[in-house]
Structure formats: C-alpha cells, structure tokens
From Swiss-Prot:
Its EC number is 2.7.1.189. It comes from the Bacteria. This is Autoinducer-2 kinase. Catalyzes the phosphorylation of autoinducer-2 (AI-2) to phospho-AI-2, which subsequently inactivates the transcriptional regulator LsrR and leads to the transcription of the lsr operon. Phosphorylates the ring-open form of (S)-4,5-dihydroxypentane-2,3-dione (DPD), which is the precursor to all AI-2 signaling molecules, at the C5 position. The keyword Transferase applies. It catalyses: (S)-4,5-dihydroxypentane-2,3-dione + ATP = (2S)-2-hydroxy-3,4-dioxopentyl phosphate + ADP + H(+). Keywords: Cytoplasm, Kinase, Transferase. It comes from Photorhabdus laumondii subsp. laumondii (strain DSM 15139 / CIP 105565 / TT01). NCBIfam families: PRK10939.1 (NF008187). One of its GO terms (cellular component) is cytoplasm. The gene is lsrK. It is found in: Cytoplasm. It is an enzyme of class 2 (transferase). GO terms for molecular function: autoinducer-2 kinase activity. Its main location: cytoplasm.
Length: 530
C-alpha cells in the first residue's frame, strides 16, 4: 500500500472500516488514495455448543474491537477526528445480522456459518426441486451460502429470535448502523443473500414467501456511495469519531476491492489471491450460468454485475505447505530478513515449467450447484530427489492455483461470451513475482499487479469520498487512483506446457472426485446440503 507521511495540503481524509473473516481494520486514506494509518484487530467466530457447523458473530465483543481499531488508526495518523470527512464500511459477504423492533442487533452469523445443511436440503426439494434454480436465475446465488436456509434454521431451532426479528442487514451495514443508528443494505453485499434481484437491485420478497419465510424483515436498499446518516453522540463516545461525521453506504469486500483496483468496466477481470482465490469478471448486463457453476453478484457500479468463481483454500494450502514442510526455510528466511514465501519462490524458479509433471489435487473449479472437492493430495510424484523435492512441490502448487483460476475463467467465458484481454492480480498472492508470471503463462494473458495491496479498503474509502462529494464518480475515481507496480507478459513456450498440464489436471481431478463419491477419501470441503 502507498504510505506517505508527508503533509496533506487539503487536510481532508477518509476512513474505511473493513470487516474481514479473520480481522477488522480501520484504515485512513488521503484524497490521493495513499494509506495514512490503520488499526487492526483479529476476531474469532466461535461455534455454538451442540450446533454443528455454526459460527456465531459476537456483536458486543466485535463492536468493541471496531472502536479500538478506529481509535488506533486516528492515534497512529496523529489526526484529530475532525479531519475525517466521511466513513464507509465493507465486510465479508454472506454474514447476516438481525435486529429487533427497537433497532437493536440481536443475532448474527459469519460468512462461514454452515449450521443450516438440513435446511438447504429442505429448500432444494421445494417445487419439485426447482426452487434453487428459480433463486439462482433471479439472484445469481444458490442456497448453499444464502440467508434463507439460515433464517429457516432460526425458525426451526430459535423461534424466539426469528419472531423478534424486524430487520435484516449484512455485517458491513451493521457497522454503519452502529455508527449512525440507521438501517439499510447495499446491493453488492445484500446480493449474496440470494434474496435480491440482479436486474432491479432490490429485494425479491416473493422468494422468501415461496420458502415459507417472513418477508417483512427486509431493510431498505441504498446504493454504495450514498449517504446513510451521521455518527451519533453514543457512537462518537465509543469510537472516537466526531459527532455528525457522514456515514456512507459501503458494500461487499470483493466488489469494493475491484473498485480499488480500477476494475469498473465491462470485461475487466481480476484474480484476487487470498485464503480463497476469487476470479471476477465484469459483465455488461445481468446474465446467469445455465449450468449454475458460477455465482453472479451485483457490482458496486450500478447496472453492472460480476461473475465470480472461487478457488477454495488456495492461500491456506500454501501456508499449510510452508508450515508443515519448510521449517528449515522459515528459519533461514528469518535470519536473512526475508519472507519465507519469497525464499521458496527463489527455489521454485529453478524448477522447469510443469514441475516435472507433479499434479496437486486441492481445490476444484467452482461448481456452485453441487460444490465439493476431492481429497487433498499430490499425484505423479517420483522418488528422484533431484526432481521431486520441496521446490518442485511449491512450484506445482503455484502452477495449480493458476490452472484452477484459468479453468474458472473458461467457465465464465463459456456462458457469458466475455473474454478478458488482460488480468489484474491482487491480494497476498500477487506479492509473488514467480506466481504472477505463472498466472500470465497459464492464462496466456498479460497480468498487471497494482501497487495498492489493500484494494478493498481503498475501494471503501472511494465510496466514502463520493458520498461526501469529494470525488465525482466511483468508477472514474477507482481508475484514477490505482497505480501499477508491474506487468507480466506470457511466455509462449510455457503457455504450451501449461495447456497440457491443465488438460491432465482436469482428467485426474475428475477421477479423484469418484473416490470421494465412493466414500474412500474425504473431501477438502463440501457445501451445506450435499
């Protein structure tokens, strides 16, 4: 991230609150998009005793952490609260919050909550098993990660909460509510509930009614970058912001991340490499996948949607490999003062493209309708230590992540007819120079890596700036503020190697899935209801 401590002539700053799966951040930017300071705190989503798959979002504790982060960011920046011209919030998608008639939050779950597996199955069976297709065709979402199964679970198991609830929002909107006292949702995040229409960008209460659920809990919809309200006296005392600071509608983390990357026009494409890898393609108009392999989300740019595929646990797989097998490299990296992944990339760069035919089996391509994966493994190892070693396996993992991304982009292109002419690679994965080059070689496309690594927070700050009139338009501002660190061009010889590796992986992965189907191996992950 660009960080500059020089004086800001305008004296005006923007704050973004970024509520991720594992942590929350308050980030301060100047009007040129430079990060000035940040406060961060980790949070944990605890399971509810005797509720398998549950991941409760602790509203009281997590609000205290948010306030702590805001105060920390202001202190680090050495800025008075009056310098903050506006604040917006973004969050992990899918996580929902319920409120009572007094507007008080009473229940919330994180995006990873999977307690409603039985309810997913029940809803799938509705209307001769056509209900999920109707939901997807309208909203771009399947039931696996949606809000309706969770609401049905509450109706079954916590009717006290279900009947108390008078409003529903996403976690980003909860942050804004705690600051302003106002309740609303934005399309980009609320779209992941499976209850919002891709075309109208408004709720579809008939979907809840078809599921036998209440439709009177849907909060007003406001677009990203519009004014929600102002910081209240109570919130100001708690978090340190000034009373009356404008609170602007934020949105979903990936969509705001794309705004921060300047991915705001049709056909522009990003690969965001974190714990999960998202492959995101801007579509010029709402369209869904007849095979239901890909999720479709509203962009923060009105009128535009994004096809999004997800590779599972890509970053987590690399961390597992580092921690399980590379203790020696971790010690060496510490002594040299370098990142362990950088050291492993230097080793892997000496391994030829194709990694001597080693095929990692971890995440499958995204199959949203029936989403599960094979058991983790490496296929086609040899016992030649010169060819099969840590460097080879590390390179094979990087190549495999790029291959799965390319396959997901192929699936999007097949139903949308949108073919990107370049990629933006962002997130933690883009720090790897070798990984960036491999992604270019596998896809055959130029790959641009931005200087800004925290693009989600920047996109959120842009929304805040538009909402208070400091920027004219979100899309144009995103394009203006993004700066590029490097562009990688595909190596034609490597492209040929990877085309064969891609075909081999697809065939081998299909066979590995049959082992899971027969109960012989354990899936890396499977969606609720399967």
């Amino acid at each position: 991230m660009n960080q500059r401590r020089s004086a800001n002539p305008s004296g005006k700053y923007l704050m973004a609150l970024d509520a991720g799966t594992g942590s929350v951040r308050a980030v301060i930017f100047d009007l040129e998009g430079n990060q000035i300071a940040a406060g961060q705190a980790e949070w944990i989503h605890q399971p509810v005793p005797d509720v398998p798959g549950s991941m409760e979002f602790d509203l009281a504790t997590n609000w205290q952490l948010v306030c702590q982060c805001i105060r920390q960011a202001l202190k680090t920046a050495q800025l008075p609260a009056s310098a903050i011209q506006g604040v917006a919030s973004c969050s992990m998608r899918e996580g929902i919050v319920l409120y009572n008639r007094n507007g008080e939050p009473i229940w919330a779950c994180a995006n990873v909550d999977a307690r409603s597996s039985q309810e997913v199955s029940e809803l799938k069976a509705l209307y001769d098993s056509t209900f999920e297709y109707d939901v997807y065709r309208c909203s771009g979402q399947t039931l696996a990660l949606g809000a309706m199964p969770r609401l049905l679970w509450l109706a079954h198991h916590r009717p006290d909460i279900y009947h108390q609830a008078t409003a529903l929002t996403m976690i980003s909107d909860w942050l804004a509510n705690m600051l302003s006292g106002e309740l609303a949702v934005d399309p980009s995040n609320a779209g992941t509930t499976g209850m919002l229409d891709l075309v109208s960008r408004d709720w579809r209460p008939d979907l809840l009614e078809m599921a036998g659920l209440r439709s009177d809990i849907l909060s007003p919809v406001k677009e990203t970058g519009t004014l929600l309200g102002y910081v209240t006296e109570k919130a100001a005392v708690q978090c340190g912001l000034n009373i009356g600071t404008p609170v602007i509608m934020g949105g979903g983390d990936v969509q705001l991340g794309c705004l921060g990357l300047g991915v705001v026009k049709p056909a522009q494409t990003a690969v965001i490499g974190g714990t999960f890898w998202q492959q995101v393609v801007n579509l010029p108009e709402p369209v869904t996948d007849p095979n239901m392999n890909t999720r479709i989300n509203p962009h923060v740019i009105p009128g535009m949607v994004q096809a999004e595929s997800i590779s599972f646990f890509t970053g987590l797989t690399m961390r597992w490999f580092r921690d399980a097998f590379c203790a020696e490299e971790k010690l060496l990296a510490e002594r040299l003062g370098v990142d362990t992944y950088s050291l492993l990339e230097d080793m892997a760069a000496r391994v030829p493209a194709g990694a001597y035919g080693v095929i990692p089996i971890f995440s499958d391509v995204m199959r949203f309708k029936a989403w599960y994966h094979a058991a983790p493994s490496f296929i086609n190892l040899s016992i030649d230590p010169e060819k099969c070693n840590k460097a080879t396996l590390f390179r094979a993992l990087e190549e495999n992540a790029a291959i799965v991304s390319a396959c997901n982009l192929d699936l999007i292109s097949a139903f949308s007819a949108v073919k990107p002419d370049s990629l933006v690679f962002a997130g933690g994965g883009s720090k790897g120079k070798l990984w960036s080059q491999i992604l270019s070689d596998v896809t055959g496309l130029p790959v641009r890596v931005p200087m800004v690594k925290e693009s989600t927070a920047l996109g959120c700050a842009i929304a805040a700036g538009v909402g208070v009139g400091l920027y004219d338009a979100m899309g144009a501002t995103g394009e203006k503020l993004v700066r590029w660190q490097h562009e990688y061009q595909p190596n034609p010889e490597h492209c040929e190697v990877y085309q064969k590796a891609k075909q081999d992986w697809q065939a081998i992965y299909a066979d590995q899935l049959t082992l899971v189907d027969h109960g012989l191996t354990t899936s890396l992950w499977k969606a609720p209801g399967l």
